[in-house]
Amino acid sequence: MNRLKEKYLKEVVPALMSKFNYKSVMQVPKIEKIVINMGVGDAVQNAKALDNAVEELALISGQKPVVTRAKKSIAGFRLREGMPIGAKVTLRGERMYEFFDKLVSVSLPRVRDFRGVSKKSFDGRGNYTLGVKEQLIFPEIDYDKVNKVRGMDIVIVTTAKTDEEARELLTLLGMPFQK
């Protein structure tokens, strides 16, 4: 079993139970899924850019991403409905815990001038969103093979009802929030 999941079951659950006075273990918030989305705007002119993004996302997440397509046509961006413009991955279960562990312990500390992630990025329903400016912070990405620096959005979906509960859950799991 993953070390982060073990930590969740042995330390985080009892801590949250006592802090929020839950009656049942099933009320304790947990991470449901992590969605990683990479928008590739230049895929409109350059089809190879999307292939590279898909490949990098597969390396980072450990599973094959799904290609996202444009919902609407936008003439200003020379975009037609149905054109591929990005890639996303939804992680659950073991892979999700592995990715979160890697993100918190390896990748985020590698960000330049890192002072912690924003406390304001909760959506009011207990989910947390985080933007990463470059894919190079992940250890799987080989610096020499990168042809373009791409960012991504990482959404951590929890079963928490409020932002306060979600913040406490993520803090106990090791998320480095700003002081």
Curated annotation (Swiss-Prot):
GO biological process: translation
Signal peptide: none
UniProt cross-references to InterPro entries, sorted A to Z: Ribosomal_uL5 (IPR002132), Ribosomal_uL5_bac-type (IPR020930), Ribosomal_uL5_C (IPR031309), Ribosomal_uL5_CS (IPR020929), Ribosomal_uL5_dom_sf (IPR022803), Ribosomal_uL5_N (IPR031310)
PROSITE patterns for this protein: RIBOSOMAL_L5
GO cellular component, one term: ribosome
Keyword terms: Ribonucleoprotein, Ribosomal protein, RNA-binding, rRNA-binding, tRNA-binding
Database matches in Pfam families: Ribosomal_L5, Ribosomal_L5_C
SUPFAM superfamilies, per database record: RL5-like
Single GO molecular function: rRNA binding
UniProt keyword RNA-binding, yes or no: yes
Task of the protein: This is one of the proteins that bind and probably mediate the attachment of the 5S RNA into the large ribosomal subunit, where it forms part of the central protuberance. In the 70S ribosome it contacts protein S13 of the 30S subunit (bridge B1b), connecting the 2 subunits; this bridge is implicated in subunit movement. Contacts the P site tRNA; the 5S rRNA and some of its associated proteins might help stabilize positioning of ribosome-bound tRNAs.
Subunit structure: Part of the 50S ribosomal subunit; part of the 5S rRNA/L5/L18/L25 subcomplex. Contacts the 5S rRNA and the P site tRNA. Forms a bridge to the 30S subunit in the 70S ribosome.
Record family assignment: Belongs to the universal ribosomal protein uL5 family.
Protein name as catalogued: Large ribosomal subunit protein uL5
Gene, per the UniProt record: rplE
